[in-house]
């Protein structure tokens, strides 16, 4: 009795529709040339963690709820006296998502979290880095449904970087548009 393995909705959509569309649009000779999602990196920098270590731990716990896997706490590398920052102090958290968790996160980001942003007019189409990767900033992490709004003491921003195997920004934009990323016109 062989049960089929779980495949995220966006991965299935990529295999069925998007791959063929991109091959036709850009004229790829090989299936492996078609750009695909590589990883998603979530980063939370907590400036207030300089004075209170618990804020970095709270941010890491929230990031774990959002991402579905344990984040790495990031530490300062150098001491900066003007910020009262010493070396090796916790100042944030980051997590890298790949495979199924990556597709699930992007699905929740596009369909649930971004529509909850106040005054959302679309994503900036100029936030590509020139090598096919896209970065966006989120001002309040409470837009994710995993975070309980009533229990939140503070809200923090976070960076989301979507890394693709695309070689150019045009290929990456076509890939992310096919995944229904709401780019501004």
Swiss-Prot record:
GO molecular function, one term: tRNA binding
GO biological process: translation
InterPro entries: Ribosomal_uL5, Ribosomal_uL5_bac-type, Ribosomal_uL5_C, Ribosomal_uL5_CS, Ribosomal_uL5_dom_sf, Ribosomal_uL5_N
GO CC terms, sorted: ribonucleoprotein complex; ribosome
Stored Gene3D superfamilies: 3.30.1440.10
Cell membrane is among the record's keywords: no
Keywords (A to Z) from UniProt: Ribonucleoprotein, Ribosomal protein, RNA-binding, rRNA-binding, tRNA-binding
Role played: This is one of the proteins that bind and probably mediate the attachment of the 5S RNA into the large ribosomal subunit, where it forms part of the central protuberance. In the 70S ribosome it contacts protein S13 of the 30S subunit (bridge B1b), connecting the 2 subunits; this bridge is implicated in subunit movement. Contacts the P site tRNA; the 5S rRNA and some of its associated proteins might help stabilize positioning of ribosome-bound tRNAs.
Family under the similarity heading: Belongs to the universal ribosomal protein uL5 family.
Description of how the protein assembles with itself and partners: Part of the 50S ribosomal subunit; part of the 5S rRNA/L5/L18/L25 subcomplex. Contacts the 5S rRNA and the P site tRNA. Forms a bridge to the 30S subunit in the 70S ribosome.
Designated name of the protein: Large ribosomal subunit protein uL5
Organism of derivation: Rhodopseudomonas palustris (strain BisB18)
